[in-house]
Structure formats: structure tokens, C-alpha cells
């Protein structure tokens, strides 16, 4: 099985909250697609709550589009990581980490403006696979934590696992 890009970086050295360019690729039509690792939690030390990450998934995707789309950027998808330490964001374009971090920070402020569970987008059995598994309070806690800690940058060259280490794992 091929080694995926996300498993070639040292998770013990990642900082959070932080933005990382996980992958950049070109389509046959020469469009740039960039995948960002939006790390909310320090791996193996913190984890996003089940209900909080689910509610954040519903809110974050729209708010990030409000703040990041335009000027050569269009978000394709934002999805939670299975390890529940962050989200992957795929987009057309190549914004720098500072622009992504500023949009992320603004989106977290937007999350805090949602005051009622009923205001969570697509919170119904027709549009959500587990519509009863939400917590606006936990999503607010996640947003407050990100805003309090600030958003940094994780660099691949600083996190790359040496070839010898990869072979030994």
C-alpha cells in the first residue's frame, strides 16, 4: 500500500492550532489544487469532542468559504480528520498560510455568533447522517480555544520524517 503524504510528517512535533500545506498538485488544465491540514489539536495529546467536531463541520465549511473564497481561491471541501485533531481543506488555488490562518480565525469568531442549536445549517434528518449528534456549546468551546491560543504554521520541511525512520515504522 502506498504511503500517504499525511503519514510522512512527524505528528509528535506538530503544533496546534496551526495551518500546514499538506499537498499541492496541478490538474491537467494547470489549475492548482492545495490541501491544507488545519490542525486544531496537538496530536496524541488533545482531541476534538465528537459532538463539537460534528457541529463545527456544519458551521466551519460555510464560514471559511465566506472568508477565503475569491481572488483565485475556491474551497472544494472541508472535512474532519478521522483522528479528530483537525480538518483537511481542499481548494482550487494556492493561498499562503497567513491568508488561510486569518480566514480560520474569522470563521472561529463567526462560530461564536451562532447562539441557538436551531441555527446550525443542515441540522435535520434529511441533510445530516447523525443529526442528533451535535453540540453548539462544544463547538463554541473549540472556537474559543483556537482564538485564545492563536493560529500558527506547521512547515513540512521541519516535520518530515527521515527515510530511515519511515522504513523502521
UniProtKB/Swiss-Prot annotation:
Sites where the protein binds Fe cation: 54, 58, 128
Pfam families linked: LuxS (PF02664)
Enzymatic reactions: S-(5-deoxy-D-ribos-5-yl)-L-homocysteine = (S)-4,5-dihydroxypentane-2,3-dione + L-homocysteine
Keyword Acyltransferase: no
GO biological process: quorum sensing
Names of the cofactor(s): Fe cation
GO molecular function: iron ion binding; S-ribosylhomocysteine lyase activity
Entries under SUPFAM superfamilies matching the protein: LuxS/MPP-like metallohydrolase
InterPro entries listed in its UniProt record: LuxS_sf, Metalloenz_LuxS/M16, S-ribosylhomocysteinase
Keyword annotations: Autoinducer synthesis, Iron, Lyase, Metal-binding, Quorum sensing
Cofactor remark from the record: Binds 1 Fe cation per subunit.
Enzyme Commission number: 4.4.1.21
Subunit structure: Homodimer.
Task performed by this protein: Involved in the synthesis of autoinducer 2 (AI-2) which is secreted by bacteria and is used to communicate both the cell density and the metabolic potential of the environment. The regulation of gene expression in response to changes in cell density is called quorum sensing. Catalyzes the transformation of S-ribosylhomocysteine (RHC) to homocysteine (HC) and 4,5-dihydroxy-2,3-pentadione (DPD).
UniProt similarity note: Belongs to the LuxS family.
Name of the protein this chain belongs to: S-ribosylhomocysteine lyase
Upper taxonomic lineage: Bacteria, Pseudomonadati, Pseudomonadota, Gammaproteobacteria, Aeromonadales
